[in-house]
């Protein structure tokens, strides 16, 4: 099983941490295991509480049902159903930027 280095960043919240995330673990699950306080609600990809934005790297979020194609194309991801496929950097707390 592959493990990737996922960097979570947010300047406003003074957040910059890199977590090892297994390919079959969501980014939110890994963050919770590391006791990070990230927003979430449904844990099923059906809301926008845990939205982040991929700055670098590749992910899989095929299970999400909330984001539209344009939002996905802009790099928005739902951390509760986001699985890393490479080392990546994700900006957290991006719900206010969904338009």
Curated annotation (Swiss-Prot):
Output the lineage of the source organism. Answer: Bacteria, Bacillati, Cyanobacteriota, Cyanophyceae, Leptolyngbyales
What keywords are annotated for this sequence in UniProt?
A: 2Fe-2S, Electron transport, Iron, Iron-sulfur, Metal-binding, Nitrogen fixation, Transport
Could you give the cofactor binding note from the entry?
A: Binds 1 [2Fe-2S] cluster.
Domain 2Fe-2S ferredoxin-type intervals? 4-96
Under what name is this protein listed? Ferredoxin-2
Q: Which cofactor does it need?
A: [2Fe-2S] cluster
Please tell me whether the keyword Transferase is annotated for this protein: no
Gene3D superfamilies in UniProt = 3.10.20.30
Q: Which residues does [2Fe-2S] cluster bind? A: 42, 47, 50, 80
Its function, per the record, reads: Ferredoxins are iron-sulfur proteins that transfer electrons in a wide variety of metabolic reactions. Donates electrons to the nitrogenase.
> Which gene holds the coding sequence for this protein?
fdxH
One Pfam family from the record: Fer2
